Amino acid sequence: MYKAVFIDVDDTLLDFNACAAQAMQRGFAMRGEAYRQEMFPVFRRINLGFWQKIETGEITRAQLEADRWNTVFAALGLPHLDGPAFEVDFKRFLTESAVPIPHALETLQILAARCPLYAATNGPQIQQETRLAKAGMLPYITRVFTSETIGAEKPSPAFFAACFAQLPQLTPADILFVGDSLTADMAGGIDSGMATCWYNPQTLPCPAEITPTYIITDLRQLPQLL
């Protein structure tokens, strides 16, 4: 039915929250700062807000990297910490963290035997390839498309157009795009002419304005769509 699969990385193949919590904790430890679990939801909320602004084109990735941790530290009452310096360490620690989503590896193994798999992510190229390799997933992925290399972020049509330009043997209709984000993945995939599969493990409601082709709650449901 489909000749290829595009698949998101963070929160589709790798558990971003678990990886980010590990990286945040390591960053605090190297500074001799006490880390408490209730700090992570503050980061998660602020980080999500920054990424939503990136997806809508309101800010650049450079602005996120410059401002993200200063905003987090201000909210946590830790203004003495250097946000840009913490950003450098956080990204390094995140690159070393690869907590898989349940059943992600076995699903990739099944899918890769049927058609080419392409990762499509807004994460940095080396970071995402390193994390996928550490999780044992990279051998099953034909190519990793990242916004860093392409120069455009999902859900921008420019991101997907650049991917398609490197795959002349495929049309958008040949591709199933799998991801957890309704905006970056589903809306972006729909607007680019691909069939879409929303990975929705929390069974969240789907807004009327976005209509994925499929909705799954467990990655083990994915092979039956091919």
Can you annotate each of these PLM segments?
Residues M1-V5, A18, L105, Q109, ...:
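Asp-based, Mg2+/Mn2+-dependent phosphohydrolase catalytic module
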Residues Y2-P102:
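N-terminal helical cap/lid subdomain that shapes the substrate entry/recognition surface
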Residues R26-R31, T107-C115:
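A short, Lys/Arg-enriched amphipathic alpha-helix followed by its capping loop at the start of a domain
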Residues F28, N47, A112, L167-P168:
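Residue-level detector of secondary-structure transition/capping positions
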Residues G32, G77, R114-C115, G136, ...:
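Glycine-centered loop/turn motif at secondary-structure junctions
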Residues T60, A98, A119, L176-F177:
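Residue-level marker of alpha-helix boundaries and capping positions
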Residues R68, F73, D89-R92, P116-A119, ...:
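N-terminal start-of-chain detector that recognizes signal peptides
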